């Protein structure tokens, strides 16, 4: 099996290499990741200028994987990775430093990279861990990465799955996407030159429902949410719907 690994935190993120190492237990791994952080980049692709890629060494004390540092978005990395490395069977994105739960998948570069792989007809999965002031212990999470990958690889292909791991998992659950409505908080500030700036600091408005991704992670479970890309509202496609 040939596996392409990417992320949105950038090629220097420890989560990227933790996922690459875990994936190497299942096949031949190739890495193509952004040269700078691309968090919340969504499914943007670069069309206004060329995308550049540079060979990149694996970190010290890590297995060697063919890797490129890409001056582009997470979705760019998948498209370019398939060009540079040739066909693959699986696209993995992460492990993101920060959860991607509920409506966060709309703007997540991590999930978008997996979606890009799925758009090419490939099986794909995104992996994330929460950031709450504690540094993730990727060595401790390794058994759960392996167990989750084993579970995913038993699915009918192609699949698209969003995986969120708590910092100390106690089990695995299949979940549905939560509804994460936000209060849009804008925090103003001023730089030393007297120019205004603004931070966006959204806060969730309600508790997560049981069986959802956010609920599962809060309870200490690895959450795996199968996704689809068809956004059609089937309830509005009634046979009696008039055509203009």
Swiss-Prot record:
Superkingdom, taxonomy of origin: Bacteria
Coiled-coil ranges per UniProt: none
Protein location: Cytoplasm
Record keywords: Cytoplasm, Hydrolase, Metal-binding, Nucleotide-binding, Plasmid
UniProt keyword annotation of Mitochondrion present: no
GO MF annotation list: 3'-nucleotidase activity; 5'-nucleotidase activity; exopolyphosphatase activity; metal ion binding; nucleotide binding
Gene Ontology CC: cytoplasm
Enzyme Commission number(s) from the entry: 3.1.3.5
Binding locations of a divalent metal cation: 8-9, 39, 96
Cofactor, how bound (note): Binds 1 divalent metal cation per subunit.
Main subcellular location: cytoplasm
Catalytic activity: a ribonucleoside 5'-phosphate + H2O = a ribonucleoside + phosphate
Cofactor names: a divalent metal cation
Function comment: Nucleotidase that shows phosphatase activity on nucleoside 5'-monophosphates.
Family: Belongs to the SurE nucleotidase family.
PANTHER family: 5'-NUCLEOTIDASE SURE (PTHR30457), 5'_3'-NUCLEOTIDASE SURE (PTHR30457:SF12)
Protein known as: 5'-nucleotidase SurE
């Amino acid at each position: 099996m040939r596996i392409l690994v990417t992320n949105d935190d950038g090629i220097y993120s420890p989560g990227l290499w933790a996922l690459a190492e875990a994936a190497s237990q299942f096949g031949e791994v190739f890495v193509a990741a952004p040269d700078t952080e691309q968090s919340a980049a969504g499914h943007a692709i670069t069309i206004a200028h060329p995308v550049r890629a540079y060979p990149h060494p694996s970190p010290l004390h890590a297995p060697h994987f063919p890797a490129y540092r890409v001056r582009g978005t997470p979705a760019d990395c998948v498209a370019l990775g398939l060009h540079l490395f040739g066909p693959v069977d699986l696209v993995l994105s992460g492990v993101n430093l920060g959860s991607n739960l509920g409506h966060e998948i709309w703007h997540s570069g991590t999930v978008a990279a997996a979606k890009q792989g799925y758009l090419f007809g490939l099986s794909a999965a995104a992996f994330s861990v929460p950031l709450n002031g504690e540094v993730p212990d990727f060595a401790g999470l390794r058994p759960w990465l392996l167990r989750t990958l084993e579970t995913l690889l038993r699915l009918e292909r192609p699949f698209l799955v969003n995986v969120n791991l708590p910092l100390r998992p106690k089990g695995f659950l299949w979940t549905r996407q939560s509804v994460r409505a936000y209060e849009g908080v804008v925090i103003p500030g001023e730089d030393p030159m007297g120019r205004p700036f603004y931070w966006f600091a959204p806060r969730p408005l309600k508790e997560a429902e049981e069986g959802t991704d956010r609920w599962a992670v809060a309870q200490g479970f690895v959450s795996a949410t199968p996704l689809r890309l068809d956004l059609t509202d089937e309830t509005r496609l009634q046979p009696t719907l008039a055509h203009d």
